[in-house]
Amino acid sequence: MTNDKYEITDIAHPEYPWLHRIRALQGVGKDVKNGDLGGYVESESNLSFEPKDNAWLFDDSIACNTAYVCQDSCLYKKSMAKDKAYISKGSSMSGSSIVEDDAMIQGASLYGNARISGTGMALSSRGGYRPTISGDVSVYGIVCGNFHLDGQTVILEGEKLYNQRDDRIILSNGIRYVERSLGRGTLQQGISRQVAPKEKKKDRTHGMVR
């Protein structure tokens, strides 16, 4: 397939000269116009150029080695996808966040110095809840759904966190608490549990001899 989305320029990264900036050959999404410069790649294998895929590298972000950014995902500032990282489903990376090794994020948002490593995963839930990960968080396990992680939180390999509820679970420096969704403290009309229909009373005189 011909890459009509972007070209790799001769502008080398000041610290990693084997990486080069990209330049848009057409508009990409709402924020990228034809001719705009983007972040750095090692090859076309790092950033999708599928038709209608608005995945993009902004600012000084990097996608290198065999890392792949696709499905409308965007990297900003100095974020980095390296090694065999896989960034998909509208994920967003900013700050100095990193996805590395064999890790993946799907529908997640990373900020600050957040790091997904090893075989770690940050995934959106079936209901569309996106985990947000910031601060100096390190994830080696799985985080899926309505979570916000910050501070020095560490998710160990083998640890699996799932939350598909409206209430957001916050993990910060070893403390876990709940951020209740709006409306949880009020009563709503028409919401009740189903009650089984009452059985008819039996005729206790049936069969009795007087």
Set out the residue ranges of the language-model regions.
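Extracellular beta-rich repeat passengers
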Residues: Y111, I116, A122-V139, V143-D167
